[in-house]
């Protein structure tokens, strides 16, 4: 039976890989995507890099939607009636959240709250996946798990923690399976130029062409778990198609110093 998948933030790297993952497993399913800055040709070009078959506008439907407006979100949910929802939307820069007067915090929490209200009001029977973040974790020298201590140190992480706590309260209510993926850093060829790995790659390319550039980054001693966005999207898909309400850490399990 044909299923409908709603992906918020579909044009980001995770959304692109997730779209590909869903259609590889279920080519007849329908994907509904939302984006604040949708460029059809750019999105299709990136998707075609990953897929070996063409899609049409009936299979993938993407629209500019303001998820900060509750009425708009209610209409989106009632009109589409998705079987699976993946909330990947919202600001993703920890650094910017430190100086944007809580805009990042407000946007992340408002988008989730609007989706939760709309789902509840529509009496949907669906699976919901929330993109959470390893930024919630307290500093630790040992391996982290779903049971590790949470201690956010930025407005971005605080927003993710608030949603994480709300999810625990929502589990078991109604016909919704609420899951979350506590994701570590992950990169791909579709990552934005403002992020560390792409900064380093672009710097190397400019140096190769003899352009004078200065690479500005933070401490080289920081240790991060970097994975591949394609692997993360595969995990997201597998988590949400299971009829369970669980939290999962998604990472490579290996830390690397930035200097490496």
Which residues fall in each region the model found?
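NAD(P)-cofactor binding segment of oxidoreductase domains
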Residues: 16, 20, 99-128
């Amino acid at each position: 039976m044909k299923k409908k998948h709603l992906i918020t933030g579909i044009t980001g790297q995770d959304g692109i890989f997730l779209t590909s993952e869903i259609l590889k497993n279920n080519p007849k399913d329908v994907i509904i995507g939302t984006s604040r800055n949708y460029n059809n040709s750019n999105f299709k070009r990136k998707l075609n890099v990953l897929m070996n078959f063409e899609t049409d506008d009936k299979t993938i439907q993407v629209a500019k939607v303001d998820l900060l407006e509750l009425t708009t979100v209610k209409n989106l949910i009632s009109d589409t009636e998705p079987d699976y929802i993946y909330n990947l939307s919202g600001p993703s820069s920890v650094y910017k959240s430190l100086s944007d007067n809580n805009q990042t915090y407000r946007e992340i929490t408002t988008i989730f709250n609007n989706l939760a209200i709309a789902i509840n009001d529509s009496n949907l029977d669906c699976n919901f996946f929330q993109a959470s973040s390893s930024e919630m974790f307290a500093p630790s020298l040992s391996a982290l798990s779903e049971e590790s201590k949470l201690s956010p140190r930025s407005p971005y992480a605080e927003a993710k923690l608030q949603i994480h706590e709300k999810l625990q309260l929502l589990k078991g209510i109604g016909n919704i399976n609420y899951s979350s993926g506590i994701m570590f850093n992950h990169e791909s060829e579709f990552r934005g130029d403002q992020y560390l790995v792409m900064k380093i790659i672009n710097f190397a390319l400019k140096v190769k062409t003899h352009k004078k550039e200065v690479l500005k980054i933070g401490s080289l001693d920081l240790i991060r778990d970097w994975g591949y966005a394609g692997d993360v999207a595969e995990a997201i898909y597998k988590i949400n198609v299971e009829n369970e309400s669980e939290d999962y850490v998604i990472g490579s399990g290996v830390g690397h110093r930035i200097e490496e």
